[in-house]
Amino acid sequence: PGSVCAAFLKNNTEADGIITTKPALVRKARELSMYTVLRYFLLDSMAYENILSQQHSVHPDFIEVLPGAMPKVIHRLCTEIKVPVIAGGLITDKESVMGALTAGATAVSSTNHKVWNL
């Protein structure tokens, strides 16, 4: 199913890439020369370790970590992986944006319109 979805997006939309939690979908999208963001929900240490191990086999263009309002964890992750990190989730104000960026995130993502206008 993931390969069908990626092919559909590539062939029938103007999408340049995908954001997904599924490593197999990242692999397929990369085969189709699409940009890829592999999203992780950092709930515990096991989720953190999954990022470290999967980055080498999946090769996403970016890794997005949620929640993004964890500068200490983002800093640690950015020193341990070579993939650019996007901080997302719970990014609600300038302080959380600056905290993530200062910690080493390449970018932040947010649905909060106030953050878009900073």
Regions found by a protein language model. Give the residues of each.
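Glycine-rich beta-to-alpha transition loops that act as phosphate-gripper elements at the mouths
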Residues: 1, 19-23, 41-44, 67-69, ...
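Short beta-strand/loop segments at the ligand-binding rim of alpha/beta enzyme cores
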Residues: 14, 32-41, 78-88
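Glycine-rich phosphate-binding active-site loops on the catalytic face of alpha/beta enzymes
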Residues: 67-70, 89-118
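N-terminal active-site wall of soluble small-molecule enzyme domains
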Residues: 1-15, 23-32, 44-54, 71-73
